[in-house]
From Swiss-Prot:
Any Pfam family hit: ADK
NAD is among the record's keywords: no
Highest rank taxon of the organism: Bacteria
Keyword GTP-binding included in the entry's annotation: no
Cited Gene3D superfamilies: P-loop containing nucleotide triphosphate hydrolases (3.40.50.300)
Catalytic activity: AMP + ATP = 2 ADP
Primary localization class, coarse: cytoplasm
Gene Ontology terms: biological process: AMP salvage
Disulfide bond sites: none
Identification of the protein by name: Adenylate kinase
UniProt family annotation: Belongs to the adenylate kinase family.
Subunit structure: Monomer.
EC number: 2.7.4.3
Amino acid sequence: MRLMLLGGPGAGKGTQASLLINRYKIPQISTGDMLRAAIAKGTPLGLSAQKIMESGGLVSDDIIIGLVKERLKNPDCDRGFLFDGFPRTLVQAEALKDAEIHLDHVIEIAVDDEEIIERISGRRIHQPSGRVYHVVNQPPKNPGVDDITGEPLIQRDDDKEETIRKRLQVYHSQTAPLVQYYKEWAESGSKEAPKFHTISGTGTVDQIFDNIVTILET
């Protein structure tokens, strides 16, 4: 089962990814984790990436694809894998295709921007414990304070509306075109193309997961 999840920030990809890797016993492949591991091991690709990062540059798609190919040779990928945060751009998607790294399913978790903003901007954190509340979906007993300690809750900078709108802007300009790319490829009838599915990201975690599993196992 070789999977990729697409969707905007706050669409619930991380939650569903955790459930999927547990169900199918496949690893979650993160380019960030791969970069850190390759640098720690001192592999040729890792050393190349380290030099670029230390000089403030962006790691090239060639290096990223090389890291992906290396990672997929590990025995834990024999049953498949789930891509996390990769590819991010059309150039990376084309590079993945050219490298003959095949996918079985690409799943878009679709959530309206305004709902994403409501989901994320409503989060409130009790910093010392890490407890998370939501002003609408999971409010504290008393507004603005932690249920257990009575200490104040904060809104992280990343959860502020202005920041979320910027992240959504980046998603729509860079990553959202991947939806069209994989959709058109699937519709082309190519044997190499993964199946493409769009599911609603609105509902409970279990409902969304059940919908994904139904798609994958039908």
